[in-house]
Design a protein with these regions (language model features):
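Short beta->alpha connector loops at strand-helix junctions that form conserved
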Residues: 32, 73-74, 91-101
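NAD(P)-binding Rossmann-fold cofactor-contacting core
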Residues: 170-186
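Short acidic low-complexity segments
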Residues: 34-42, 187-202
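Single conserved hydrophobic/aromatic residue that forms the stacking wall/gate
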Residues: 206-214
Length: 214
């Protein structure tokens, strides 16, 4: 039987996830949260580690002599020193397509909040405010239409491309910056550019990249 350690559980609603398939694979220890300095002691002689946001440094990894696999329960794996893992022969895996549609949807929801101020006007109506006698509406902010405006997307990967498709459906033009350019996306409604050029004409910017890109 394998020895498995889950260093930090991703946020979940009570009873939402069934961990029994994981527990069936071996002796499993769960932690809700693990500070970086406690990681090595908690991993101990475990062969398999699962984590969400716990930081695993080279110093920590070198203390874990029996470690064979690190499974990141997320898309980003920048909290793990992958260069050190490669040196030590530790396999690192992640969930590359996790939540791509949901994250794009959330980005669009935030954008529409900026343009339409739905939350503000909802709160005002709940306070009892109305447009007044003879008027069926009111607004404290002008509605900003997205049609014809330009959006800047930094990081045109899985999430960035889904977001771009939605923005194009609104009639927006797309400027994108990415270290790895996809020729199939270079067209009249989307073009790649450098960061300085991207910032100049855009109305809205969507960031889908690690902090190191900037």
């Amino acid at each position: 039987m394998h020895k498995i350690v889950l260093l930090d559980k991703p946020r979940e609603n009570p009873g939402e996830l069934d961990w029994s398939p994981l527990q069936a694979l071996g002796e499993t220890t769960f932690y809700t949260h693990t500070e970086p300095e406690k990681a090595a002691a908690r991993i101990g002689d475990a062969e398999i580690v699962l984590l969400n946001k716990t930081v695993l440094t080279a110093e920590t990894l070198r203390q874990c002599k029996n470690l064979k696999l690190i499974s990141v329960i997320a898309t980003g794996y920048n909290t793990v020193d992958v260069d050190c893992c490669r040196e030590l022969g530790i396999t690192v895996c992640n969930v590359p397509s996790y939540g791509s549609e949901a994250i794009s949807q959330n980005a669009i929801a935030l954008l529409l909040e900026l343009t339409n101020r739905v939350a503000h006007h909802d709160a005002e109506v709940r306070k009892g405010r109305s447009g007044g006698p003879g008027d069926w509406c009111f607004w404290d902010y002008s509605v900003m239409e997205l049609e014809g405006k330009t959006a800047g997307i930094i990081g045109l990967g899985r999430i960035g491309k889904i977001t771009a498709r939605i923005l194009r459906a609104f009639g927006m033009k797309i400027l994108a910056h990415d270290m790895y350019q996809d020729p199939a996306w270079e067209n009249e409604s989307c073009r790649y550019t450098d960061l300085d050029t991207l910032y100049a004409p855009v109305s809205y910017t969507h960031l889908r990249a690690h902090e190191t890109v900037l």
